[in-house]
Amino acid sequence: MPSYENLLYEESDGVAVITLNRPERLNAMDNTSCEELRAVWAHLRYNDDVRCVILTATGERAFSTGVDITGSWKQPASPFMVDDPISTVGPKSNDYWRPVIAAVNGMAAGGAFYLLGEVEFIIASDNATFFDPHVSHGMPAVNEPMFMLQRMPLGEVMRMSLLGRHERMSAQRAFQIGLVQEVVPLDDLLDTARWCAEAIASAPERLAIEATMKGLWTAQYTTLANAMNSGVAFLSLAGAEEEITEKARGIKEQTRIEPRIR
């Protein structure tokens, strides 16, 4: 089991839980945090025991407030070679293609959107808030809002970006616009995320889950026609046609699942 300085990691029953663990800094990410996030995704890419991941944070105040501005960040001298220290901390940026559920507690601000923009869905506690403080500090809000444009309407992203620290989006509002898929009391946050993760991990075929994800993310970032063409390839990679047909025939023999109504 890997160990880290700024992350907590545990796994059981096919589910890994990654916890940002700098509550004294509102779980802001320093250089060590960024290196460890990249390392944990690399570890998970080769860990077939894990079928689903929960990404959360320690404490009630914040999921993450983005970059730790008190940290030491090296930059090239040229303005055309600026390093964004947290641009590659998310699962997709590290080529990790198994489901990741974000369990958001407290504030999610600025650079936290690099993480939230690359998860499959978000469950938030009722005390969660979302905002981007860049313009309030005299800095352009650019990359983080671009991630949010994939999950929120343009007007909502504009409002969040331009108002900066003057306004925070509540968990309920985030749910209304589709950024968040479920809002629960703080005490129920991890249990709810784990229920979803264990349900996903229980799927009989791992490749079916991965192909579903790959298809939907492809459709999100390209044209429908291109995505549909890719979908044929994803079906083939997940199993030969005769295998899929055989599985379809066996549906009636499967144990009945009693669904939860959300």
Task: Give the location of each predicted region.
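Hydrophobic/aromatic residues within transmembrane alpha-helices
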Residues: 18, 55, 68, 115-117, ...
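Short, active-site-adjacent cap segments at secondary-structure transitions
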Residues: 60-64, 109, 131, 216-219
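Conserved CoA-thioester-binding segment of acyl-CoA-metabolizing enzymes
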Residues: 1-56, 60
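Crotonase-fold acyl-CoA enzyme core
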Residues: 94-204
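C-terminal alpha-helix plus adjacent terminal tail
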Residues: 1-13, 71, 165-173, 187, ...
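Histidine-centered beta-alpha loop that forms part of the nucleotide-sugar donor binding/catalytic region
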Residues: 21, 67, 105
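Glycine- (often His-adjacent) and acidic-residue-rich active-site loop
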Residues: 57-95, 108, 136, 250, ...
